Amino acid sequence: MKWYLDFGHGGKDSGAVSANKTKESDTVLKIGMLIKNNLEKNNEKVITTREKDLYYSLDYRTSKANKENCDYFISLHMNSSTNKSAKGVEVWVYDEKSKVYNLSKNICTNLSKDINTPNRGVKISKNFSVLRKTKMPSILIEIDFISNSTVENSLKDDTYIKDIANSISNSLLAFVNKPIVDDNFSYCVCIGKFKDKDTALY
């Protein structure tokens, strides 16, 4: 498979910034590069938007993924809220018929368990450019709330960062029937039933 990993924001666009100035753009880059390495170790092809703290437009991201004919588009973000107690993982997809809808459910289930954060579930939106303009099945992962002080403190721990990366990597690998990164992890893989082959998972 060829994966497109989109690390949100970058450069002049820091994305969400915590009370202690932890940047979303830096956080997802660190996590994303670990995911890239995990996938490549399993002989998966990976294309990225960026591998440094650089800015790229939303149109650049989707155009590059489409030009590369990637099989799946995975966009990584950290969430933020004025409610500083908000916490949990959620994944956005274009609609419920998406081929990656069940993958999104699995990511929520597994990441919630692996880093002990609430499962906020799969959400639907046709407004996200990276979901709307990509030709391949796409998801946008909101890993957790960088605005939550507990989450922000955890992000300083390299083991926690690695746990996030491994959890997401393993959900992706399980989706395409590849071995998981760490045998100590157990993963939920929901396949489901479909009426036609175009909406079936494979």
What are these regions (language model features)?
Residues M1-K21:
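Short glycine-rich His-centered loop
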Residues W3, T22-D182:
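Active-site-proximal helix/loop segments of hydrolytic enzymes
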Residues D6-H9, D13, F73, A86, ...:
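Short glycine/serine/threonine-biased micro-segments
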Residues G10-D13, V17, S81, E90, ...:
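Gly/Ser/Thr-rich beta-alpha loop segments that engage phosphate groups in nucleotides
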Residues V17, L54, C188-V189:
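Generic anion/oxyanion-binding catalytic loop in active/binding sites
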Residues I180-Y202:
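Solvent-exposed beta-strand motifs enriched in subsets of small alpha/beta binding domains
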